[in-house]
Amino acid sequence: MLLCVSANHKKTSFTVLEQLARVSPDFASELVEAEDIDGAAILSTCNRFEVYIDAIQKGDQDDVCKTGLLVQNRIGELCNISPSTIIEQTSFLAGCEVSRHLFSVATGLESMIIGETEIAGQVKRALTYAQKCRTTSPELERLFQRASAVNRHIRQSTKINEVGQSLVSLSLDLASSRIGDWSGVRAIIVGTGKYASKALALLKERGVVDISVYSPSGHVNNICNTEGVRNIFNLQTALSGCDLVVGCSSVDKPVITKQDIETAQASGSRTSRVRPVGRPSTDLTAIEASNRSRHVLIDLGLPRNFDPAISDLPTADLIDLDMLRVHAPFDNLAAEKMAHELAIESSSQFVNDCKQHEATPVIVSFRNYLESLTQTSLRRTDNCKHAQHALKHFVNSLIHIPLTRCKQLAANGESHKFAESMEILFDVKTDCTEGTQYQSSCGKSFD
C-alpha cells in the first residue's frame, strides 16, 4: 500500500520544516530495512518534506495507521521534535489519496506559489536518488513516473504555467522596492544548485552584471564557470562590497550571521545601491550619502542560509521564506480549478491501472493454463499449422470474456474473486490476495 507522511508550508511551521530539512536522505534506506516496507522515497524542498512509502499491507486500517504513526515518530526522533508536534504538523495519506497528492504536488498545485515549475524537477530527482540508493519499489516508480507525466499533461492542457512564478522571481520582485537601479547592483549568490542557477538567470534578466558565486562546500560546477560570473572564496571580504546576497545553499547552519553583516557594513567603502523601504526613488542622492553600506539578503535556504537576527539591523533587509509565504500572489482560479480536476482524474486512472496490475498474476496463470492445454492438444493433431491456428483462435475467443470480467473485478478491488474461481474450477493457484491496496483506504487522509 502506498503511504505518505507530508510536512509542507500549508500545515507545518518553517521552524519545524527547517528541522526536517536536516533529515539525512539515507532515512529511506533505514525505512526499507523494516520487514513491512518494500520501498521509500523522500521529497525535500525549501517548503516541503515528504516521505513516500510502499508498505506491505498485512491487516486492516488500524495497521495502516500504525505504520504511518511509526514513521512519523521516527522522523520526530531524528529531528528532536516531540511526537505531539510531529503528528500535529504533518499529514498522513494512504491509498489513492497518495497519488492524488503527489500529482498535485508535481504540477505545482500544492506549492507556495501556485503553478511554480521547480517542483517538477525536484520530484524527478527524488525518484532518481531513491533508485540510486536502491530504496524504491516498482509501485513507487510507477507513482513518481506517472506524476511527471501528469505534470506535463496538465501544463499542456491548462494555463497553469501562466499562473506560477518561482520563489526566486517573487523574492526579487520584493527586493525591487529596495533597489533603485538593478544594473548597478553588486550581487552574491550563495550556492551552486538549481535555485542558484535560477537566481543567476533572473538577475541577468534584470540587468545585473556584477555577480559573484560563493559555494560553502567549495563545490565548483557549471554556474561557477558561467561567463561574467566570479567565484569568491572569502565571503566576509566580499560582503563589504556587495548590495544583494541570495542564499540558495543546503547547509546545516547559517553561512552569514548578524555580526558578519555588521562587520561588512563597518568596513564597506562603496556607496550602496540599496535604499530603505519607503524612501522615494527621487531621494537617491540623499540616501547614498546617508547609507554608505546597506544590504538586501534573500534567504531561500532550508535550513536557513542567513541568521534571522539580521532582520534586526536597521541597515539590512532580510527576505526569507516566512515573508514569501505572506506575499505569495493570488492564483488564477480558473486555471487552478481545471488543473486540480485533471489531477484528480489522473489519480483515478492511476488507481484503476494499479488495480488491474494487481490482477496480472491471475491473468498470467489463466493464460498459462490454457496454453498448456493448447500444446497438449496440438501434440495429438500432428501439430499442423492449420490446426495450430484454429486452436489458438478458439482459445483466444474463449479467454476474452473471462479476462474482461477479471479486469472489471480488479477495477472494483475484487480480483481475488476471479482467482478463487480459477482455483475451484481449474485448480489454478495464484498469489493474488484478497482485496487491493487501494480499496479500504481510498479517499482517506489522516491528519
UniProtKB/Swiss-Prot annotation:
Coiled-coil region list: none
Q: Which residues bind NADP(+)?
A: G191, T192, G193, K194, Y195, A196
Tell me the residue numbers annotated for binding substrate: T45, C46, N47, R48, S111, E116, T117, E118, Q122
The main enzyme category here is: oxidoreductase
According to UniProt, the reaction catalysed is: (S)-4-amino-5-oxopentanoate + tRNA(Glu) + NADP(+) = L-glutamyl-tRNA(Glu) + NADPH + H(+)
**Xref: InterPro entries:** 4pyrrol_synth_GluRdtase, 4pyrrol_synth_GluRdtase_dimer, 4pyrrol_synth_GluRdtase_N, GluRdtase_CS, GluRdtase_dimer_dom_sf, GluRdtase_N_sf, NAD(P)-bd_dom_sf, Shikm_DH/Glu-tRNA_Rdtase
**Which parts of the sequence are marked as the site Important for activity?**
H101
Q: Which UniProt keywords apply?
A: NADP, Oxidoreductase, Porphyrin biosynthesis
Superkingdom: Bacteria
Pathway where it operates: Porphyrin-containing compound metabolism; protoporphyrin-IX biosynthesis; 5-aminolevulinate from L-glutamyl-tRNA(Glu): step 1/2
**Enzyme Commission numbers on file:** 1.2.1.70
Which example biological process does GO assign this protein? protoporphyrinogen IX biosynthetic process from glutamate
**What is a single molecular function from GO for this protein?**
NADP binding
Catalytic residue list: C46 (nucleophile)
Which family does the UniProt entry place this protein in? Belongs to the glutamyl-tRNA reductase family.
Q: What is said about the domains?
A: Possesses an unusual extended V-shaped dimeric structure with each monomer consisting of three distinct domains arranged along a curved 'spinal' alpha-helix. The N-terminal catalytic domain specifically recognizes the glutamate moiety of the substrate. The second domain is the NADPH-binding domain, and the third C-terminal domain is responsible for dimerization.
Q: Report quaternary structure and partners.
A: Homodimer.
> What does this gene product do?
Catalyzes the NADPH-dependent reduction of glutamyl-tRNA(Glu) to glutamate 1-semialdehyde (GSA).
Q: State any further remark.
A: During catalysis, the active site Cys acts as a nucleophile attacking the alpha-carbonyl group of tRNA-bound glutamate with the formation of a thioester intermediate between enzyme and glutamate, and the concomitant release of tRNA(Glu). The thioester intermediate is finally reduced by direct hydride transfer from NADPH, to form the product GSA.
- Kindly provide the name given to this protein in its UniProt entry: Glutamyl-tRNA reductase
What are the leading ranks of the lineage? Bacteria, Bacillati, Actinomycetota, Actinomycetes, Micrococcales
Gene name? Answer: hemA
